[in-house]
Amino acid sequence: MEDIMKKKMAAFLAVSMLLCGQALAADFSNLVIIHTNDTHGFDRRAEGINGMATVSALRKHYLSQGKDVLLVDAGDAIQDNNLVNFSKGKSAIAFMNAAGYDAMALGNHEFDYGQDVLAERIREAKFPMLSANVIVEATNKPLTKDSVIYKKGDVKLSLIHISEPT
């Protein structure tokens, strides 16, 4: 399995280097990337933490200005407060769907409720959850997509995620 990951990473890096010249020609002036991580399901603002309402309002603000917005999360979104723990992350996915997330990486805490619950959350999400290296043992198939490509205005973006071992 490790050899497959090394080959995938080498191919990804090779393609990335070939595309660098094209990226320099792209116009990024209208692109806004909103990134969250380690939100742990906080649906409202708390000390030092912006909630989903703030994230959603920020996205809507930029869209109203005609910006091309990409809203992504780097993981650890579905666990660690009473509401999301009670719903096993279901409420966090509902908030993220309502906020208009484009993609999410699997963090180590996405696995806290077990693989079956995570599979339910993946099905509920209106956005792809990504991980290039999580394989379901029973099927030997990937749990999620490894990458996704977005076109925002004149810019093409590829997102890929490699999960940290849990």
What do these predicted regions represent?
Residues 25-163:
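Acidic, metal/ion-coordinating pockets
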Residues 14-20:
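Bacterial N-terminal signal peptides
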Residues 2-8:
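Positively charged n-region of N-terminal signal peptides that target proteins for export
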